[in-house]
């Protein structure tokens, strides 16, 4: 599933080619995504100039003169720029055609993504209750410490809660906890302020490094230019259960937390 770095990579790839451009037509070949694509999307967006492309959590916000297209890549989706007129292949559900001669093509084999229209996106029900962005000053270790008091859940699903902080998905939660030396199974409410301060720093560092590398391509993800990400080469623990720890050589273990597999080092993480 594309996580925050992959979505930010997509945003950075498509924004320069969309901003300031006018939409000539929207072609929807299949409306059946997680929620149906609005039947009048072509009418609403065609003829409008795209003002900006922003990201909120794992949602892309394509802001037009009137209204915003809210897009989510789901489990296997991607948005990429192609030349106008390029024939569509299987699973290529939407084309946003631009007067520049390019079009933004949405591909989603599993159809768990979304394309919705809103006149007030930040108050849309999907975005309204989201926590702070992890790479801003609104997120820090003090926030983690305060919100964790009295919480008996494991720390990994705690930091993956979008009400606590957005965009810390399975890959990057696993890596940040390893970097901070915290066992993902530990009770969130039992971790000290000092360790949460360290964890917040590592969350920011890991996410920033992943964005710099263009995200992590494990299976489906490609950026807006059609290229894969390279952060998978930097992974210390995610997907390496049963293999030796890169730092100490201890065999990495796996645990199930919140229906997700979690890999950790029993020696490096306490």
UniProtKB/Swiss-Prot annotation:
One Pfam family of this chain: zf-FPG_IleRS
GO BP annotations, alphabetical order: base-excision repair
Organism superkingdom: Bacteria
Reactions this protein catalyses: Hydrolysis of DNA containing ring-opened 7-methylguanine residues, releasing 2,6-diamino-4-hydroxy-5-(N-methyl)formamidopyrimidine; 2'-deoxyribonucleotide-(2'-deoxyribose 5'-phosphate)-2'-deoxyribonucleotide-DNA = a 3'-end 2'-deoxyribonucleotide-(2,3-dehydro-2,3-deoxyribose 5'-phosphate)-DNA + a 5'-end 5'-phospho-2'-deoxyribonucleoside-DNA + H(+)
Keyword line: DNA damage, DNA repair, DNA-binding, Glycosidase, Hydrolase, Lyase, Metal-binding, Multifunctional enzyme, Zinc, Zinc-finger
GO molecular function, one term: class I DNA-(apurinic or apyrimidinic site) endonuclease activity
Family: Belongs to the FPG family.
Protein role: Involved in base excision repair of DNA damaged by oxidation or by mutagenic agents. Acts as a DNA glycosylase that recognizes and removes damaged bases. Has a preference for oxidized purines, such as 7,8-dihydro-8-oxoguanine (8-oxoG). Has AP (apurinic/apyrimidinic) lyase activity and introduces nicks in the DNA strand. Cleaves the DNA backbone by beta-delta elimination to generate a single-strand break at the site of the removed base with both 3'- and 5'-phosphates.
Alphabetized InterPro entries for the sequence: DNA_glyclase/AP_lyase_DNA-bd, DNA_glyclase_Znf_dom_DNA_BS, Formamido-pyr_DNA_Glyclase, FPG_cat, MutM-like_N-ter, Ribosomal_uS13-like_H2TH, Znf_DNA_glyclase/AP_lyase, Znf_FPG/IleRS
Name listed for the protein in its UniProt record: Formamidopyrimidine-DNA glycosylase
Residues that, per the record, bind DNA: 91, 110, 151
Disulfide bonds: none
Cofactor(s) essential for the protein: Zn(2+)
Zinc finger (FPG-type): 236-270
Active site annotation, chain numbering: 2 (schiff-base intermediate with dna), 3 (proton donor), 58 (proton donor), 260 (proton donor)
Oligomeric form and interacting partners: Monomer.
Entry-linked SUPFAM superfamilies: Glucocorticoid receptor-like (DNA-binding domain), N-terminal domain of MutM-like DNA repair proteins, S13-like H2TH domain
Keyword hit for Transport: no
